[in-house]
Amino acid sequence: MLIHLEKLGKSFGEKVVLHDVSASVEKEDRIGIVGQNGAGKTTLLKILTGVYTDYDGEFSVTHGVTLGYLEQNAKLDVTLDIYGEMRSSFAPVLDAMARMQILEKKMAASPDDAALLEKHDELQNIIDAADGYNMDVNIKKVLSGMGFAQDTWSKNVGVLSGGELTRLRLAKLLLEKPDVLILDEPTNHLDFATMEWLENYLKGYSGAVLVVSHDRYFLDNVCTKIWEVSFQTMTTYKGNFSAYLPQKEAADALRQKQHDADVALAEKLQDYIDRNLVRASTTKMAQSRRKQLEKLEITEAPQDETNQLKFRFEYDVEPWNELVLLKDLTIKIGDRTLLEPFTYTVCRGQRLIIAGPNGAGKSTLMQVLDGKRRPSGGMVRLGTGARPSIFAQQQNRIGAGRVIDVIWNKYPRMTELEVRSHLAKLGFRGETVFKPCEALSGGELARLRFAEIVLERPNLLFLDEPTNHLDIYTRENLTEALMAYTGTLLLVTHDRHLMNSLACPILYLEDGKAVIYPSYDALMGRAAPAPVAEKSSEPAKAGYGKEQRRRRAELRAKIKACEDEMEACGAREVELENEINSPEVYNDPQLLREKSDELSDLRFHQDELFAAWEAAVEEQEQYEQTAGGEE
């Protein structure tokens, strides 16, 4: 046994966070710590890592056992390069090696000196215990696995990004090889290949691993036990997260059955007491039942965190089949190309996941697709009848006021009961509906935005990293809601469980190139990508006469005119939408009607423009193909 917890408890003033927690950690345990946000997982970690020393009960670590914890803000030496920072983990070993070299020179002069031999053995043990002779091999292995290419090893630590610093801290901790490795959300800031490397590394780790994570894919691949922190206590389950779910369901069913039996017995005893206490002949028996009732401890009913949210995304308006059309779409920021010319069509009811390494431009691409940012070239077109809703990474659009006001101001015809019932489906119950929006956590802001989207009834969803800030149970609820959604979905995510559950194509964006893969497994195996219709890169050959050249010039001019007018219409569309949502227009029925009519006419004209543009492009492509076949 490496760690033992016995009746552990922790309170902050009158608030009890943990109570009567008992568990143990054995060598080679792989323990996933799960629970709702705020359940006490962080408090438990701070006790385990010695941050909190004031607690009830017993927490003991076996003598000689080392604990390693990934501190998010652990200091690194900004004067070193990446490789030098990794070597600094071996400072005692490097010191022992240097001392051994000096010692060996002395031993050469005095080979029979027993004290020198004894000191040599001590230094040798220090080096062997840390696998010092394989130091550089292990450093290179871990750096490569954690996503640091060899040409970056000389990069100064002081210029690394936040994500790179987090990966470097984790790499150093892995090298130190503590007996118990304690990790808090280790897959944050990691790309898919690095996640898989880390999973394989941890599965073969010689010590024990405790990890707090909301990443179900990771918990399923690595963990052999689950610690569920819930309602001030903790329960241990055998197996990975998928194995934990049915065990929890069975345990909750048994607990509910016992709770119901206890309540029924209490009611039966109380009924007997009420009927017989006043009768002289049955007073003693009633008093006996009263003592029995006073001693009865009613089993607490289970609280099901895994299924607390009840929401679905539904829509009313059926759009055109070709719903999101990308034509030679190009995105640049300054001199950097995020997306080279790319053509693709998302049809009604289809799903498309956008993935790629950090900084590849996924969120920028999503902003172009949902109309928040203009492309550098080409175009994005939403089909007729599209009713989009947008979930951005930063929920800045939710302003001040209370939670209940966010919904009520937008839907004033709803009664208070209707608003509160709706918010309850997204986890806002009781007094939490009156909580100020500025006091909400990231997870609460996300749930509030989901509450808005449900009422918007969109047939097209643009979601940018919607699982960020969500606990694992809310992620499960969101996954179920998206799987049940029959509208069109464009989704940026790094959640591998969500990706596999949706079982849809993945647009992988890297180094300016977009490639479509049929699934996550195909992406990781780098299987042949799904075919995507794109224009030939071979230039058209000119073999026409004068009339054909004239017509091609007309088509180019028409396409350019359509694109210019569509861009102007798009800008006006954004202006009108902003005006319609402003209080000045929203509260003026006549003005609102005028603006709405103008927007409707504008969108009809956009459809006409797009039809003309599409016909011209198709005719132009026919000329190009004909020209290519002339030679």
Where are these regions (language model features)?
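Intracellular alpha-helical coupling/juxtamembrane segments of multi-pass membrane proteins
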Residues: 247-272, 276-296, 300-302
